[in-house]
């Protein structure tokens, strides 16, 4: 193995990264600096994390608050594109990875590290996301991925490894699910979820009520949108992160934002995940409602194309690329008229936009009415239809 002087590890305080600290020191003879990203995973997850890192053998631990930046500079731009991976997944884990990688590189530069490390498995997407970001931001730094090197293959072996070194760890061998949380969402994988025929039990979900346990009375929430960004909730002007937190609090009791999907991983296999994205689901519904009013047909079509490509870009970890900048520039242009107000009804897991208005709305009641009007001459439709269907007519005549 190569020898490094100082390695910055993306540290969570969980079992895997607690074992990685001593493993790096033993196998690479290096000093280990722990880096913890606060992306809104909650105070419970961060409590005592610095002490855990030091107890595991790290010489220092940096906890960096990334919540505001993550929402304003990563989530909100992605929302403007309308990106939804494979029609369902709102990219909660994917959007958080580039800002974590960027902050990790910044800490590495600050402390003079010559390598970076992460606790991603060799089967998952995150190894590609992190290392693609590292390649774009710090191609001179080496990357150590212990899960691709060590012979520790189970939770039991990791616990034994720590016990042999008298390193305290609160994890247990009976943990069922692998979870990842941030301000946007929480993901659940593993356990019985690995069988797609197995219905997830309520113990899987940790954030939202089940629709059955949700209130029997619907709740209305009003969102104000300016150029594709949610700026106010129920009349209260808030920063992006605070808008998200408020909507999470409002939507989660109603069971909003639960999805159970089998997705195509970047590395080639399929995986099943259960995701909870309460506030984000409400935001997306509001932005879609505004788009219905302000985008013409061609613009909506192209936004769908851009959003589909951007969803794959984010999922695949290609944030720091020229393509990302190009698509976001297009999304900005398409969002310049996306200003308005939306009232959404939350009820037993469902979000419905029940009222919407915009100063840039292209909807005209005068043209759309089923009643009598004096702005649309229906006889004009005949000529339009003949021209619109001309190619079909020519093809049919050619077959005679």
Swiss-Prot record:
Pathway: Amino-acid biosynthesis; L-arginine biosynthesis; L-arginine from L-ornithine and carbamoyl phosphate: step 2/3. CDD domains: ASS. One of its GO terms (molecular function) is argininosuccinate synthase activity. Its EC number is 6.3.4.5. ATP binds at residues 10-18, 37, 119. Keywords: Amino-acid biosynthesis, Arginine biosynthesis, ATP-binding, Cytoplasm, Ligase, Nucleotide-binding. One of its GO terms (cellular component) is cytoplasm. L-aspartate binds at residues 121, 125-126. It comes from the Bacteria. The keyword Thylakoid does not apply. L-citrulline binds at residues 89, 94, 125, 129, 178, 187, 263, 275. Its main location: cytoplasm. It is found in: Cytoplasm. InterPro entries: Arginosuc_syn_C (IPR048268), Arginosuc_syn_N (IPR048267), Arginosuc_synth (IPR001518), Arginosuc_synth_CS (IPR018223), Arginosuc_synth_type_1_subfam (IPR023434), AS_cat/multimer_dom_body (IPR024074), Rossmann-like_a/b/a_fold (IPR014729). Homotetramer. Belongs to the argininosuccinate synthase family. Type 1 subfamily. This is Argininosuccinate synthase. It comes from Pseudoalteromonas translucida (strain TAC 125).
